[in-house]
């Protein structure tokens, strides 16, 4: 099961063992996507502090996992969310003027990778070679530079 971010969160944070919160990786993926949406202001600004607490917990628990569904680094306050190109769902462009750059997380195959801007953290070596940044002001592509053994940010205008 996944937590409901909007009901009695602080009490549940004290009572629930985090290692038994998620029954499977699918529920964990959905939960982490909700965390990212709150952090980027797409859900509720009032829930940002909740998101900050969750980010630290999730990072400490799952940063060493080898499961592709759990390749996640969460850091606040600045987030950039990367989704696999084959998992990008249909966007909803009616709610915000820049909504075309933020995709609705309905795909069950979707996995996300979050890291702070401006892309200074280490890139996950097991991740796909390119992942797309979904952010209100830019759309970029990440590529691995074999010579520098590091991540290069390339501007990307279309899929």
Swiss-Prot record:
This is Uncharacterized mitochondrial protein AtMg01050. It comes from the Eukaryota. It comes from Arabidopsis thaliana (Mouse-ear cress). Its main location: mitochondrion. Keywords: Mitochondrion. It is found in: Mitochondrion. GO terms for cellular component: mitochondrion. A stretch of 270 kb of the mitochondrial genome is duplicated within the centromere of chromosome 2 resulting in the duplication of the gene. The expression of this duplicated gene (At2g07672) is demonstrated.
């Amino acid at each position: 099961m996944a937590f409901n971010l909007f009901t009695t969160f602080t009490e549940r944070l004290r009572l629930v063992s985090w290692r038994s919160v998620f029954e499977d990786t699918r529920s964990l993926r959905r939960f982490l996507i909700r965390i990212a949406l709150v952090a980027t202001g797409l859900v509720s600004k009032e829930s940002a502090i909740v998101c900050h607490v969750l980010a630290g917990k999730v990072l400490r628990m799952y940063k060493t996992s080898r499961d592709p569904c759990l390749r996640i680094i969460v850091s606040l306050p600045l987030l950039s969310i990367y989704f696999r190109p084959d998992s990008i769902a249909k966007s909803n462009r009616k709610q915000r003027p820049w909504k075309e750059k933020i995709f609705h997380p309905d795909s069950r195959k979707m996995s996300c990778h979050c890291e702070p801007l401006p892309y200074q953290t280490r890139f996950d070596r097991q991740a796909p070679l390119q992942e797309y940044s979904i952010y209100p002001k830019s759309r970029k592509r990440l590529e691995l530079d074999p010579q520098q053994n590091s991540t290069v940010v390339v501007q990307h205008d279309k899929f």
